[in-house]
């Protein structure tokens, strides 16, 4: 066991180790030094403001300072008011002056708030756009080290910190600082000795703050890394949900999630404990200062009375004024410090953003770079290169070759030998480590303007990425960069004061003449839909697109999930060709196409290659696609062998090539080059061997026939190639709308209902609906932590009662100041009491804050885990919905749950504290002076209501945004609100980063996101004004209330109704309560946001999956007894999310046990859907799809009783369902049997454990190679992993890496080539030892040698391990040895059925069979 555990440890880099590795880039001491020595400008967040907004900042600052300066005046007359009330003198003139000051404070605070809200909106927008521009223009090494999920997570986190730290919190700092300084200076002038005595604890508070701040920063930095890791786990799991479900990997993902969250909680709780300790110390030390003040103030009065201080008229009224002044200034400090902490977080976040914004990319943009009249030649000279993430692995060894205009070049070689990296170097995603890339003999690629260079390149990658947009816009994206030039010019003209933006405009404008710029703008204006249609016809997708209900406006879905792989690839080809590039790069451009589509697209590519002004570069494993290239370069990363084997046997050559020649760690080089014919002459050459491995064996009897027959066949093929057979090819019409939904512009029912017309202010002040009872699940979770809740309860009891008791002691102390006989005794007594209160306050506040945060973290972790777990186990139709994209769901899991914690969980404690404080204060106040207490209670309730209305603005803003989502702002073809959401657009851009860079869409997306931000902020001016008015009232309300209280108290005292002493006791208790009420109401906005988040969280949390692997029901399976026979009987199927598209029509066939069954058909004919049904991603049970016959718009309605989907006309959506003639009912029915038992009757987990699937686009996770291979089988040892790696022909490559099986594959496996990813996926599938192996284009990304090895391995596995194999492939060579080949066909678009089935030879013998035509096209 010890050895196995060691092996597992060696091969498994834990989450903690990964994060510690990240932290160790800087030692702990270095981190402390950095925190200490970072010289960050205090006004850094405002650095990006243009001149006009800086004027607003100055106005806001001045008004905030003047507003705070009004408070010292109130304190200065406080003693006079007390004196006049005791003497019965008139105080009305003083009250009127206080009211006047209150009005001034109201106006000043309102102006300050309005200006700051405008500034905050501008800052957040500018920082976001500058961050995005910088990220978009970074180099490939940067993006290797900073995956999109991390960049997006960091951006959200940092902007949230900036948003929290500026705005009203920033002006609060200056307002209250002004009050603090004014009061403190006044107190010093009044009596410096007493003031200094009271404030002697300030240095200690400062030292504690510095020490605590260092500890908090370090722990929060660590916790942020773990939080980023958690987000990466969530996003990858949702992106690869089909892989997770098919391998029953939910528990594996959840375990990694729990581990990451555990470490996050550990470090965040350390930070929270230090913060709680700091808060407790501040509260306790402030009360200690008052104990000193009470004692020393008495000493001064006594000494003054005995003439120890000559000429000192210091008396009790002076002590009261100073104590109150310092008391309020101290309270100002307690408000300032948390806001300063928030602002310091904003400073640090801004600094982190500017580290990215100011980062100079390794591949510079070359503002003044050269532009060339043409591109005639590209030459690699002794190029060496390694990736920054794997510096020990050299990719190339003195690579040299030349590419010339008008020629076509192909690069071939084993997977991982660096073919795709050549393309990345040409695109200048990276620069060579050594050597040069020379253009036109004399221009180094580094000296050429980067944006201009990339504008001349069209790319079709191996794994095409499309945006969640329409087909039309996806094709147009290649020319949208031209639109950016015009949009950016207008933008910069309007923002001429912004240096950063001007610099970027200079980048473009300096690289071309005004005439060129004008021509490009003119060229963009001519991009018409007809151009899109023309290019679609060239790549043969026009018929397919035209058959869709929305045609070119059809949305492709998140990650193009509504398209098959072949459809995505052809749209990607159309996008590249639309650009008419000077350099056309085709990286496995036809790897996902069926033979017929490949032939047609390849013919188009061949036509394009004839362009005399274009360099065409092709990478392909299908060597038939490159035979007409002018030059073929064969790359190898193996050691040269002088002993060539003369044996012509393919297998022997293959074995020699792979086993005798070891991988060369010094990098790849060109081992052969030439035309197809010249390379084929070398019988022992690698290229010749690769060709032989891909040859398709025709029927032996046909091959042995007469030469004339062969010649005729050859002639027929040539005729078809030249066009004589084109009609026949086109007659095989392409019906590929399996995965396309009817994406008509779907409007929500609520958007069509007439909204209640309520005036704005009435809407603000009307009563809210009660919170949903469902919130009890959160409260229940909170109170499940009984020990923590008990500690919080007692700490609230203590802390809630201490302030009113302190207020009572304060009032009694004031009374003793006029009782000179007992003055010394009473002051000593009250000083001791306050010291005891200070100790109790320190303990209670520390415990309350720490356990409040502790429960919050526990609840957040639990809620996040439950939501993530419930989402993971949903059926696939849930993820097919546009509202459930990975980006949206991950936001729900992270942001919404966090808002629930801060807005509900944490605020419960604060609210409970306030209730306790309020109840004690009211009891005391009513006891001493019921009349004053009643009036003040009424006034405070009105004041609190105003606070609540201000807080509701946040919620109303969100509601208004939702109400306005139906208006069209962008050039999208859908009304879906995602396209108007900046977060969604950023998610799109970051996930498709390579495409954004390739097609120069950096500025396009920045402009699009800017419009989305402007739309989001649209119409907020009135709301800002109302918020400013309410803020002004909140700042001046205390002055108005006190003025009224003094007037009312004076009135009652004059009438003899109450005593001055009782009035003071009642008043002081309410002063403390009112100050805490303001703190409570300032958090009200968080509560409203939390309730909004709960409305999103709760439906996802309680949603029951219709196909749940957690269900233990069903027939349990003994794996050893399963034979593996699969029967498909009369299956009719439509996707619930795409009800108008029939997928299958009475589909029936059998996959025999222990045999290999291959499925072939055109792209989009439903081949992959069969595997989805087999894995029970979708069910055929009780699914009814009801369509309205005259449907124009769709609205989904899920009927939970019979699991049916009802789609109705939105405009007629009502309680009446209409007559039966208005609807057409389709049933998903039929059976899929495994060993003669319906698969729905089996236990779902047991069923999926019988299968292993290797998909066309394999999904790997951001883990080590070892962890990825053992995914789905956690009990596997390192030896098991190594064994299957040899089967998958990937072991030699892994062993050549510095970290071997511990090598991390990067986010989504991006650190590996396509072929390497696919071989690891094959190893992962084999490790599960499945009874049924599903191969969906499993070898599409492999080189010929690896493909042959894998095919041989698969045959051996089938023979030795009793496995049923079901394979989908477009390469006929990979399926010709199958026991049965099933041909899918969908000629009338009414659903796919089985056209024919049989062996390869049987199907070839059929006259005019579709399969025979496929074989012909594959030659």
From Swiss-Prot:
> Listed GO molecular functions?
ABC-type transporter activity; ATP binding; ATP hydrolysis activity; ATPase-coupled transmembrane transporter activity; metal ion binding
Q: Topological domain, Vacuolar: which ranges?
A: 82-90, 190-191, 297-316, 810-829, 1054-1057
What happens on changing residue 331 to A? Results in less ATPase activity when stimulated with mefloquine or halofantrine, indicating the role of the residue in mefloquine and halofantrine binding
Do you know which InterPro entries this protein is assigned to? AAA+_ATPase (IPR003593), ABC1_TM_dom (IPR011527), ABC1_TM_sf (IPR036640), ABC_transporter-like_ATP-bd (IPR003439), ABC_transporter-like_CS (IPR017871), P-loop_NTPase (IPR027417), Type_1_exporter (IPR039421)
Site entry: Important for mefloquine and halofantrine binding: 331
Compositionally biased spans, kind Polar residues = 723-749
Q: Which reaction does it catalyse?
A: ATP + H2O + xenobioticSide 1 = ADP + phosphate + xenobioticSide 2
Residue positions binding Mg(2+) 2? 1168, 1256
E.C. code: 7.6.2.2
Instruction: State where Mg(2+) 1 binds.
Output: 462
Annotated ATP 1 binding lies at: 387, 389-390, 415, 417-421, 462, 1312-1313, 1315-1316
Which ranges are annotated Low complexity under compositional bias? 643-665, 697-715
Cite the ranges annotated as topological domain Cytoplasmic. 1-60, 112-168, 213-275, 338-788, 851-907, 950-1032, 1079-1419
Residues spanning the membrane: 61-81, 91-111, 169-189, 192-212, 276-296, 317-337, 789-809, 830-850, 908-928, 929-949, 1033-1053, 1058-1078
Name the enzyme group at the top EC level: translocase
What SMART domains would the database entry show? AAA (SM00382)
Superkingdom to which the source organism belongs: Eukaryota
Annotated ABC transmembrane type-1 domain residues:
58-345, 791-1083
Q: Where in the cell is it found?
A: Vacuole membrane
Signal sequence extent:
none
Renumbered to this chain, region (R domain) spans 1-37
Q: What is the effect of changing residue 221 to Q?
A: Significantly increases ATPase activity
**Protein name (record):** Multidrug resistance protein 1
Q: Which organism is it from?
A: Plasmodium falciparum (isolate 3D7)
Lineage of the species this protein comes from: Eukaryota, Sar, Alveolata, Apicomplexa, Aconoidasida
